[in-house]
């Protein structure tokens, strides 16, 4: 509210935002920070004009803050609801996909049962020996229990739902095209079966049409033989047979054309199915060769990585670890011997106070003896650690010269005995090999890996 105390006597002019009013000065409220009085000819300064702004009520500020908080909370709730809907849709999609996979597994199981009972797929005669071929996969499937086959189909169908990486791998390796070719082959087989049924139907209709026409022609010939003795009914019958003969000839020709068309379609489907099956087996052979080459190279890469890691561990990490252990052991021994020497010096000082100089000299000599003892302990630390394993000591004591295959075999046996005697649970137990044993171990590892990969 703005107030103006001006030239009028005792009636101030009160300027308000809402209304304009006059009231006595005794009833006017005193000056506060939201009103500005201009008495006589006083003019406000620039500093006071900045304070002439109207103060907003507290309830308006409170409403604005509440509204901002409500809008922010509403936005968060909308985001949470949209996220919940997204995850719900994803869950329902996966559940429906799992249901479809189970239905597909049931369908495959029923198809397998039908294939077992199909007489066309039961040919098991060996042409060379005229004996029965045994050990076919279909026979083994027959001997399996139904629940195990059903469980296998369920796992195979759910694998496509749970492991989408398989589909990506198939796309990368090209097996998705082979699967499409397999599905097209199954569709072609169904079309061929339907075409064969249709061919049989039209062929039967064509045979019936030929029989009907032949019968009508025989009846016409009989009527023509006794043409001189025709009656009115014979004349009507001859006329009807003549008309039917024309219709039968037309129907016979149509059925003949349809039979030819169905036969050509059946031959085309047979040729396409034969070529599709050949293409499928050819592509599967190419795919299997590609996967075999990839697995071989992967095996070699893994073998190289193992050898590299073994070399790094034996040539870099193990010496560093051994050096660190030896250094920590030396520091502990030095600190322990120094403490022991100090204690002995203090005891000698208490017992013989007059001979302190001699004690100090003896302490110096003891320190020199301790240092020499530490050096000797640092040099023979590995040898003392190896006394618990006589096999390792004997392996290092043997000469590196080998003169025959028997020496090589004995050396390899000693190497494996050494490996067997290693205490793997103790991290501070060093692995001691010489250069020849290391090369023998690497060569045996490489040869065994190549042998296993070749057998696979």
Curated annotation (Swiss-Prot):
Gene Ontology BP, a term: inner mitochondrial membrane organization
Coiled-coil stretches: 71-128, 178-277
Family matches, as InterPro entries: MDM33_fungi
Subcellular location, principal: mitochondrion
One cellular component (GO) term of this entry: mitochondrial inner membrane
Subcellular location: Mitochondrion inner membrane
Transit peptide residues according to the UniProt entry: 1-30
Membrane-topology descriptor: Multi-pass membrane protein
Transmembrane annotation, as ranges: 297-317, 436-456
UniProt entry keywords in alphabetical sequence: Coiled coil, Membrane, Mitochondrion, Mitochondrion inner membrane, Transit peptide, Transmembrane, Transmembrane helix
Mitochondrial matrix compartment residues: 32-296
Name of a matching Pfam family: She9_MDM33
Mitochondrial intermembrane face residues: 318-435
Function description: Required for the maintenance of the structure of the mitochondrial inner membrane. Involved in mitochondrial morphology. Causes growth arrest when highly overexpressed.
Subunit description: Homooligomer.
Family of the protein in this entry: Belongs to the SHE9 family.
Name listed for the protein in its UniProt record: Sensitive to high expression protein 9, mitochondrial
Gene name, Swiss-Prot/TrEMBL: SHE9
